[in-house]
Amino acid sequence: PIKGYDVLVARLESLGYRQPTADSPGNLVPMPYDWRLSNRFTAAWMAPTIQRELERWRAQGGRYADAQVVFVCHSMGGLVARRYAAAHGADHVRKIVTFGTPMRGSMNAVDQLANGAPWKLGPLRGLVTDLSRSLPSLHQLLPSYACVVPDSGGELTHLDPGGIPHGDPAMVADGLAFHTEVEAAETTDPTFAAKVHAIVGTNQPTQSTVRFTGGGTEF
């Protein structure tokens, strides 16, 4: 089971989807993953399982012979699915359905790197802060859009890999490159935009810009 998603899986099974077994193919394949790791790694790790189960399903023949993959993703899982399609399987991905995926990154990632974990964590704050700053996945959640308010005013600028307080420039650059790679691959597929179905919330307070100051950050 995938903790927190049991109800969704049960609902899909009630609609007739079934998980594969050793003896029978299935068309519902839960993919829990280690969210701390790079989304590049996770997409590559998923590929053999997805492609194996897709081939088993297609082997039934008939109307299943041309089956394709539909991803149902929450939060960062949508970035993993986009990376999978871009690097491993655009030809057999039919849809990517996402719930609350930060497609172009999240200002929360900047906050975590620059300011650390919340103070309410008490004595665990330092440990959680150090852990967060070591995660490739957190850096791949950094905003890819122009989000920095310059001191002089004027147009917003993109994040500078060396400009985030307490950030590792190499890890920041790698995280930003993740978005560049995925977006570049997607632009070569004129059908890709129609494959993504993003379900989002409205009227939710969301930080979208940051100003770096001598004393820290202003969101």
Regions found by a protein language model. Give the residues of each.
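C-terminal subdomain of alpha/beta-hydrolase-fold enzymes, centered on the catalytic histidine
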Residues: 165-219
